[in-house]
Amino acid sequence: MTGADKRDSCGDRPKADRNLMSNKTISLTTSGGLIEGECDPKFDGVLQTFVENFEKRDELGASLCISLEGRTIVDLWGGKVAPGGAPWSRDTISVVFSATKGASALCAHMAADRGLLDFDAPVIRYWPAFGQAGKEAALTSMMLDHSVGLPHLRAPLKKGAFYDYDHMIGLLEREEPFWRPGTRNGYHGVTSAWTVGEMVHRSTGKRLGKFFRDEVATPLGIDFWIGLPAEHEPRVAPMIFAPVTDEVRNSRISQAATDEKDSATHYFMFNNGGFNPNSREAHAAEIGSATGISNARGLAGLYAPLANGGELNGLRLVSRDAVTRMSLCSIATHEDVTLRIPTRFSLGFMKAMDNRGLENAAHCSLIISDPAFGHVGAGGSIGFADPASRMSFGYTMNRMGFGILMNDRGQSLIDAAYRALGYRSDAGGVWIDSNR
């Protein structure tokens, strides 16, 4: 794994003012299998919730890592890599789907922080061929906050299109936007792999996967890959898809995808060129929106510097100003054009997604504190940084849950973490520090 022997992925810098105790070793047998790891006693509520996910919420295999002020306070894993399969081990990794977007966004912010990329500049300054079919005025920032108007492609994609980077770049260059860039907000579920990835490529001279490996994963010592080397394939837990129930069929996103044949939602759901997230082709491809492969330590380790002003253990990834930009909402809508729910994004990061108005989806929203930012992945994986509490959080799993991206397994762990910090829930959909 990348630098795994060099440093604890979640950091190891202690801070006395949190009154944290020494972590205790965990080894618990549940109905879903063995749970192992370590946990600070102050976060026993998080441990209990992790156990409940296996006992009550149909968890199969999962990992959870939380750091506070650079110190790992929760590091848990357990369950099975497949139904009836081997135990989920400390080094098991899995596809984190759109939680990859946070890693891609960080790369873009690093390029901007180095003066290589200007978020206020036209895209065509860096990528001239992008300025076709009504996209000539698009700004770089629009590529990051899902407002550029390319949530998907209309023409049927060839088999394996997502694995062919240059092919996808050419299609996006020629595609007419679904709306005038900057005027609406619609989740770019897969296409941001190439819109954001190519901005990193054009500004730094490195493809996204290589930039991430060289400038982020290796220096941090995290087990996180955008383009997985073949030798790590045996560690990957396959993703188990949620069954299609009547509740899923009757959801707003499913109804729109089925009934509105020329909508962004329809193309997002059905035009995927036979994409298979469990294939070696998907794992090897540098799809910076969807096929990052990691575990909870990798996700929490990615966000640990961002929860601490851009620096961890003497390694500075970005400036404090860059972290502030990541935290500030860039665009918000009451109905995302693609997802058909309220969403809020900063430049490249998700701030909130609100499923609370949907039937049987009260616990399938992303509810974090107002300064926090990160990204959810399909099925429920999640990573985020909270600069106010200096907490970083990572959760991965292999049995995908119901709901649009988020589900109650991941959100219940987030809720437990904030409660352990003394936060209280707000009806508006954020966690608030009770001590402030």
What is each PLM-predicted segment?
Residues 5-8, 12, 17-19:
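Intrinsic-disorder-associated, low-complexity terminal segments enriched in Asp/Asn/His/Tyr and depleted
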Residues 34-97, 118-121:
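Short, conserved catalytic-motif segment at the N-terminal edge
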Residues 44-51, 70, 93-120, 196-201, ...:
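Active-site SXXK
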Residues 82-91, 402-414:
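A short, polar/charged loop-to-alpha-helix boundary motif
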Residues 89-91, 175-182, 192-194, 279-288:
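Flexible glycine/proline-enriched surface loops and loop-helix/loop-strand junctions
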Residues 90, 95-99, 113-155, 173-174, ...:
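Active-site helix/loop module of the DD-peptidase/beta-lactamase fold
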Residues 145-146, 192-199, 286, 290-312, ...:
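Active-site-proximal alpha-helical segments within enzyme catalytic domains
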Residues 241-296, 328-387, 423-436:
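Active-site Gly/Thr loop motif
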